[in-house]
């Protein structure tokens, strides 16, 4: 095991979760800096029309990124189980299968992106002035998604080994490339919104090459020669199916959550450019506020998978309990900071009109408040379920969160009951409550049925 790696099957759990989660928080922040920098640069150079374009396109980007991360995370979970079992050959097979799934997934996303971008944005009521920018951004991102797919596949392998520092270094380089290209392509090169997409694609492709090289050099399980030799007793298809068994529910889970945000954005678009721009900025800020939660969740998934692979079920249970407490505590601090700094954060995104600023601040007042505690709990329990081998629960919870509450309640409150866009904000805040309770019941059932 590399010096940068951590084993969650031994040692103090909280310290190991913290040591693993901190670099992942930085990784997640840097990854979303791509979208944040895109929005800030486009907002300053192109103006409100460009900001609406990229706000809508960013929702599409989140769906693509969510699918990429979710699908490759399935491979990471399978690898982590083999890490816990100390099975290098199994790690090699799982990694090879993950790369194969990633390449197939990138091809599918490219085809779907080109075919569906324009009709999807048209159906979602993107203002005419912003339509071309949103379509162009999305098409470039989808056609160039092989880089992000391969980067996340390699990063999932590294994280399964307990190595969170190497992904941080790679994403750091990628972020610097992205910022530099944004400053050149959006303004001086005259590409506008599409230039921001090209900057992201090139930057992530650079990180992909670096990640693949690092995995091969540092880890025996990352050397693919002989992964599926003819004399082996595990066929290629079986390894691919195992990755897909975890990866598809995980990918669908993350994708449907982001799809629901795109649908909610469609509801908000009907209230005009000011509300749409304000909500886009508010969503970006609340997304960044959720990054620590996601990092801790990734730590929980890896730790749970390693311990499940090693047969340490009692320790896996402790991962869920300690991780959830850790996550909720961190999010309390984040939500307080957002509430105190909301006006300044909104101004940093280039919003200057009083109505737009007030709407964005209201978005944060409602969606970054007490509901964050339920969100942190929901994400922690779902992350444990994924690592422990129950991906279908994660998918079911995401459908409740995304469609039953976030979109369904938003449609009811804003339209049927006449609360307007404020009703949409309230629905977004309420969405994690029910899934958090279901996750808590699952953990209780899991511990009782395994007598731990």
Language-model regions, residue ranges each:
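Small-residue hotspots at the loop-to-helix junctions and early N-terminal turns
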Residues: 46-59, 134-138, 197, 273-288, ...
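Transmembrane alpha-helix boundary and packing residues in multipass membrane permease domains
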Residues: 24, 28, 40, 77, ...
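N-terminal transmembrane alpha-helices
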Residues: 8-45, 59-74, 78, 103-110, ...
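Helix-terminus/linker motif at the lipid-water interface of multi-pass membrane proteins
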Residues: 29, 33-52, 121-128, 184-191, ...
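Transmembrane alpha-helical segments of integral membrane proteins
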Residues: 378-379, 405-414
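Small-residue-rich hydrophobic transmembrane alpha-helices
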Residues: 51-111, 148-167, 278-342, 375-397
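Transmembrane helical elements of multi-pass membrane transporters/channels
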Residues: 19-38, 140, 144, 151, ...
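Short alpha-helical transmembrane segments in multi-pass integral membrane proteins
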Residues: 1-21, 79-146, 177-180, 188-248, ...
